[in-house]
């Protein structure tokens, strides 16, 4: 009896988790007006003997895990496209790539 109850609870949790993952995935796909980007700055940061971390250059920030002595310098940017006006048809047409030109021999 206990085995059947335990198996039933495992199946119920599995179904609930699957539904949650599906709903979270479809919600993330509908957020086309927001963009969060992360770029590696090409350098690492290290924990010094004093407990402080070396600084990253430019717009980069040191991100590290607890207990580790080496971190990554990363640049993060959040863009909310709802703050920008919708482009007009003319602006969209002007932004299209130009067709390839064929090279001519002189």
UniProtKB/Swiss-Prot annotation:
Subcellular localization, as worded in the UniProt entry: Secreted
Signal peptide limits: 1-28
Coiled-coil annotated spans: none
Disulfide bonds: 41-60, 45-62, 56-73
Major subcellular location class: secreted
Keywords, sorted A to Z: Disulfide bond, Glycoprotein, Secreted, Signal
Glycosylation sites: 44, 59
An example molecular function term from Gene Ontology annotations: C-X-C chemokine binding
A Gene Ontology term for the protein's cellular component: extracellular region
Protein purpose: Salivary chemokine-binding protein which binds to host chemokines CXCL1, CXCL2, CXCL5 and CXCL8.
Protein name: Evasin P1132
């Amino acid at each position: 009896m206990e085995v059947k109850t335990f198996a039933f609870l495992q199946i119920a949790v599995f179904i609930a988790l699957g539904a949650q993952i599906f709903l979270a995935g479809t919600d993330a796909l509908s957020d086309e007006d927001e963009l969060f980007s992360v770029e590696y700055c090409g350098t690492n940061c290290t924990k010094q003997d004093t407990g402080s971390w070396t600084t990253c250059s430019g717009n980069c920030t040191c991100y590290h895990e607890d207990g580790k002595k080496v971190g990554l310098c990363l640049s993060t940017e959040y863009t909310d496209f709802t703050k920008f006006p919708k482009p007009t048809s003319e602006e969209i047409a002007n932004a299209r790539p130009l067709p390839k030109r064929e090279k001519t021999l002189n």
